[in-house]
A protein has these predicted regions:
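ALDH superfamily catalytic-core signature
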Residues: 1-98, 161
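Conserved C-terminal structural/oligomerization subdomain of aldehyde/semialdehyde dehydrogenase
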Residues: 34, 81-204
Length: 204
């Protein structure tokens, strides 16, 4: 999906004790991603949906540089053979941004991620909640009790623990803040899609 769906996060918060190791492994994996024909099963990254959307996504790269960020991988266009007219771009990783920057708090809908370190549970919760959006997030930890505690403190409609995009149509789907109102899924869908009618009669 090239980061173009609502459930794709555009920032990763990394505990400072593993920050450098995680960053280096993330860069290595991102640079290995195969960009090309989406009908090829070995392809991992396809084209963006349109030229206008690519311009919008790339504008966030320019904004990140203006905000003091550093592009640590990505940015160059990829033009796979036979698909030169596509809206290609390599996934971008940005570090060095303030957690309050626009690039770190807005929805980008493209293959861009900002990375940030944190040193405490309260700090990561504060950073996670420092956005106008709240649809979904993912927590990765070997300490499930801590992960559950943090999940309950994050102002988001959905939190995955040690997984991502794991959907069950029987459970509620929806966000908070600017990420929407109400829930779909299971019995919640009946309320969401129902249109109750009120008929009021005055009797003499």
């Amino acid at each position: 999906n090239q980061g173009q769906i609502c459930l794709c996060g555009s920032r990763i918060l990394i505990e400072d004790s593993i920050y450098e190791n995680f960053k280096n492994r993330l860069i290595e994996r991102v640079e290995q991603l195969k960009i090309g024909d989406p009908s090829d099963e070995s392809t991992e990254i396809g084209s963006l949906i349109s030229g206008d959307h690519r311009k919008k996504v790339l504008s966030y790269v320019d904004l990140a540089i203006e905000e003091g960020g550093e592009i640590i991988t990505g940015l160059q266009y990829e033009n796979p053979t036979g698909f030169e007219g596509g809206n290609w771009m390599k996934p971008v990783i940005i570090e060095g941004l303030s957690v309050n920057s626009r690039c770190s708090t807005e929805e980008i809908f493209g293959p861009i991620v900002t990375i940030h370190s944190f040193s405490s549970e309260q700090e990561v919760i504060s950073i996670a909640n420092n956005t106008d959006y709240g649809l979904a997030g993912s927590i990765w930890s070997s300490d499930i009790e801590k992960a559950q505690r943090v999940a309950k403190s994050i102002n988001s409609g959905m939190i995955w623990i040690n997984t991502w995009l794991h959907r069950d149509l029987r459970v509620p789907f929806g966000g908070v803040k600017k990420s929407g109102v109400g829930r779909e899924g299971g019995m919640w869908s009946l309320d969401f899609f129902s249109e109750p009618m009120n008929i009021c009669i005055k009797h003499d």
